[in-house]
Amino acid sequence: MAKQIQFDETARQALLRGVEQIAKAVKSTLGPAGRNVVIDKKFGSPLITKDGVTVAKEIELEDPFENMGAQLVREVSSKTNDVAGDGTTTATVLAESIYREGLRNVTAGANPISLQRGIMKAADSVVEELKKISKPVDSSKEVAQVATVSANWDAEIGNIIAEAMDKVGKDGTITVEEAKGIETTLDVVEGMQFDKGYLSPYFVTNAETMEAVLENPYILIHEKKINNLKDFLPLLEKVAKSGRPFLVIAEDIEGEALATLVVNRLRGVLNICAVKAPGFGDRRKAMMEDIAILTGGKCITEDLGIKLENVGIEDLGQAKRVVVSKDETVIVEGSAKSSDIEARISQIRRQIKDTTSDYDREKLQERLAKLAGGVAVIHVGAATETEMKEKKARVDDALHATRAAVEEGIVPGGGVALIRAQKAIDTLKLEGDEATGAQIVYRAVEAPLRQLACNAGREGALIVANVKGMKNTAEGYNVATDKYEDLLSAGVVDPTKVTRSALQNAASIAGLLLTTECVIADKPEKKSCSCGSGASDMGGMGGMGGMGMM
């Protein structure tokens, strides 16, 4: 396919037009006074959103050169969302500001490579300063504040996320689902939960709820299938003598072994329940080892060299309570040593850090959550499907922002932290175009606060000047109340990770755009005209008319 090429200033200006178009759409959503964007969908009702990355992902421009600029800024937004889960609009505002200001200097004759170096050095110094002014998240109240700000000042969402984190801990799993009603609610599953239910309904102890509830049971964790009763019988007799319930977790239980368990359950000889092990392959083995550690038992595998007929009571795990339904099993309060669980958690954390697969990372985080505390489910309710989707997106944003805050701490919100970190650029001893690049970042970090003020109908430059004149580093402009106040006390906070990621990603892409000298795109194909075939058809019809006149 033929290509079209643009060079120098023509190329950079085309990229700038694309950057400005996507930035104009995205930055209108910034802050509590930001506006909604309505996105048309081919199927179903239009999507209404205030989420920057959602808006950015929908934008595709007609001009291929302008579209390149738009897509690169979209990359800033997406990357920030992937790393921190929030701050996508801030990242877009920063990227546009750095690129526009930098392009002005390149046009005036500055060396783009030196500008890029200065931009990156200034961004790194601001990031280090942000880390210094960062404050750790210590209380549930601070978690609620972060979540409220990220959810566009929805206190209900903020409080529910804080409650969920309080119950399952910072390593616990919190999932977001659509509710059937209009209320937003929180459900918490304590203990280890996995998606495998009983192998036979005859194991049920509560006919109303169709659940098998085992109080203070012994737990067998077996890697292979159990189908030979002869090997299993010695252990069954030992457990029956103890008089305690018995949970069997194995790859599968079938044939005479399963039939014997069912008969013993029906006769009341033994309160027993059998379930399949969760997962597949190596992940199944790892999850069974997790269950063994949680319950203080052994995972009976071929590697250990222990045969089923030789398993003793001391090899079994124990728990305070086990609830098994048709589709899932929940083990509450396993009798493990806390040191063993901590060691396992540390091991999984190392695996999360080392893995390069997003899928593996997600599964490892699920395992970590199940060991660490439990699973919380936030059911998002709303009056209409459109409102529910918009609200669910805000809950997801708030959840990611809260995790980021717990990880790296918080800084004053409302764009103030970036302005307070400006002073770090003054300490850099740069010369020439590198110093110019640093000054570009110095001015760009004011852009988020300026945009917040503009969206609220205020004069951005005046607000920035007033904030810079304040002596208390936590003081700034609260857009929600239209007041200058201590933002940390007022609960206007941003996660350090979000602010840091937004600046780093914006500086990276803007620097690359500035050093662009040539852009190449596919040449659009000319649409072939179908006039010729239409004319010949008409001619044929005319001939037929002539025949009719004869």
Swiss-Prot record:
It is an enzyme of class 5 (isomerase). Keywords: ATP-binding, Chaperone, Cytoplasm, Isomerase, Nucleotide-binding. The keyword Isomerase applies. SUPFAM superfamilies: GroEL apical domain-like, GroEL equatorial domain-like, GroEL-intermediate domain like. Pfam families: Cpn60_TCP1. One of its GO terms (biological process) is protein refolding. Its main location: cytoplasm. It is found in: Cytoplasm. Its EC number is 5.6.1.7. It catalyses: ATP + H2O + a folded polypeptide = ADP + phosphate + an unfolded polypeptide. GO terms for molecular function: ATP binding; ATP-dependent protein folding chaperone; isomerase activity; unfolded protein binding. ATP binds at residues 29-32, 50, 86-90, 414, 478-480, 494. InterPro entries: Chaperonin_Cpn60_CS, Cpn60/GroEL, Cpn60/GroEL/TCP-1, GroEL-like_apical_dom_sf, GROEL-like_equatorial_sf, TCP-1-like_intermed_sf. GO terms for cellular component: cytoplasm. NCBIfam families: GroEL (TIGR02348), PRK00013.1 (NF000592), PRK12849.1 (NF009487), PRK12850.1 (NF009488), PRK12851.1 (NF009489). Together with its co-chaperonin GroES, plays an essential role in assisting protein folding. The GroEL-GroES system forms a nano-cage that allows encapsulation of the non-native substrate proteins and provides a physical environment optimized to promote and accelerate protein folding. Belongs to the chaperonin (HSP60) family. Forms a cylinder of 14 subunits composed of two heptameric rings stacked back-to-back. Interacts with the co-chaperonin GroES. This is Chaperonin GroEL. The lineage of its organism: Bacteria, Pseudomonadati, Verrucomicrobiota, Verrucomicrobiia, Verrucomicrobiales.
